[in-house]
Amino acid sequence: LEAKIFARTQSSFLSQALKYQPGVRVEDNCQNCGFSQVRINGLDGPYSQILVDSRPVYSALAGVYGLEQIPTNMIERIEVLRGGGSALFGSSAIAGVINVITKEPVASSASASHEIRGIGGLNAFENTTDLNATYVTDNNQIGLTLFGQLHHRSPYDHTGDGYSEMPK
């Protein structure tokens, strides 16, 4: 997956971009904590190895938590290797490998975005604000990229029983 696909599909995060890769499914598993997990060839998240710039993220939870914390405007491309890769990438790569190649900071820039989504019509809303800044020194020796996110979701009671299926 390349950056032009992120723009065409309006993907803001790694989890949204992965939905357009065949054989990869991103599922929202917990309405309380809001985590999503990636499934490659139907296997759960802990069976997938996540790499950032070809370096492994050593955690069985890497395929579960953090997929919403990598914005697509920091990603150059995503390489997905489906199938057993445990001989090359370790025991966490039974389902496959997702290699996130980040962009090199080449110019100072800043961006901000805000997204509002309705949940169940106009009964509840989900607000997400993202800030992204890149700083590069004049001699191009040092580059720094920062990302921040503020997320708020109002509770939503679909069944009307007084209990929220989607708490804050």
Placement of each model-derived feature along the sequence:
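Extracytoplasmic beta-strand/coil segments of soluble accessory domains associated
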Residues: 15-59, 76-77
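Periplasmic-side early beta-strands and strand-to-turn transitions of outer-membrane beta-barrels
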Residues: 108-110, 115-121, 128-168
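Short acidic/polar hinge/loop motifs at secondary-structure boundaries
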Residues: 55-82
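Transmembrane beta-barrel domains of outer membrane proteins
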Residues: 17, 41, 81, 101, ...
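Short, polar/charged loop or turn motifs at beta-strand boundaries
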Residues: 1-11, 38-43, 53, 118-120
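N-terminal Sec signal peptide and the immediately downstream disordered periplasmic leader
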Residues: 1-9, 15-19, 23, 134
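Transmembrane beta-barrel architecture of outer-membrane proteins
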Residues: 9, 13, 35, 65, ...
